[in-house]
């Protein structure tokens, strides 16, 4: 189960984002990780990304994933996310699991697809260190396409990172530099 129903203040630079630490209780967290370990992942690669991805988790009926979908997508939490980011009512979520291994990455992009308003990523890898790679990097960008890295977030186990999707919400997952596997559950809140 979700351990909180509130979101602390949203950071505004380089674009609105927040980190909710210790998001799930230990029992739910263990069940979710076990459920994700039992899924099949497909390798996806292009010049923009390299990672392993699950199917859409909104299409899987599994007790632990059903609880997680409720924790991330129930009316109370969606209202809290909308309030924190000062956006209109959020209608639905989608989600998938991603595994980044040695050499995998996701280059800078803005997530603007299909009425996405807020992106989120629940980090499920314990003890990820900066030297492992796999940081969530946020860029300051302008409409002319110029950008620079201004914030590097080392994913903390059981933390939920969320940010507003816009034409300036450029971000990336830095290349994995060691043999660690970076497991995240990622998705979007839609209007």
Indicate where each model-derived feature is located.
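Catalytic core of non-heme Fe(II) oxygenases with the double-stranded beta-helix
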Residues: 61, 66-70, 77-191
């Amino acid at each position: 189960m979700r351990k909180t129903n509130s979101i602390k203040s949203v950071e505004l630079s380089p674009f609105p984002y927040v980190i909710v630490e210790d998001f799930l209780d230990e029992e739910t967290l263990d069940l979710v990780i076990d459920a994700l370990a039992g899924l099949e992942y497909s390798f996806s690669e292009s010049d923009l990304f390299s990672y392993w991805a699950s199917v859409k988790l909104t299409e899987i009926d599994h007790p632990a994933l059903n609880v997680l979908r409720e924790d991330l997508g129930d009316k109370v939490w969606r209202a809290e996310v909308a309030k924190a980011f000062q956006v209109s009512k959020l209608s639905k979520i989608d989600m998938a699991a991603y595994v980044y291994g040695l050499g995998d990455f996701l280059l800078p992009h803005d997530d603007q697809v299909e009425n996405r308003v807020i992106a989120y990523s629940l980090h499920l890898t314990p003890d990820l260190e900066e030297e492992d790679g796999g940081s969530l990097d946020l860029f300051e960008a302008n409409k002319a396409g110029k950008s620079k890295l201004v914030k590097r977030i080392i994913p903390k186990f059981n933390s939920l990172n969320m940010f507003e999707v816009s034409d300036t919400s450029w971000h990336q997952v830095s290349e994995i530099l060691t043999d660690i596997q970076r497991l995240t559950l990622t998705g979007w809140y839609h209007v």
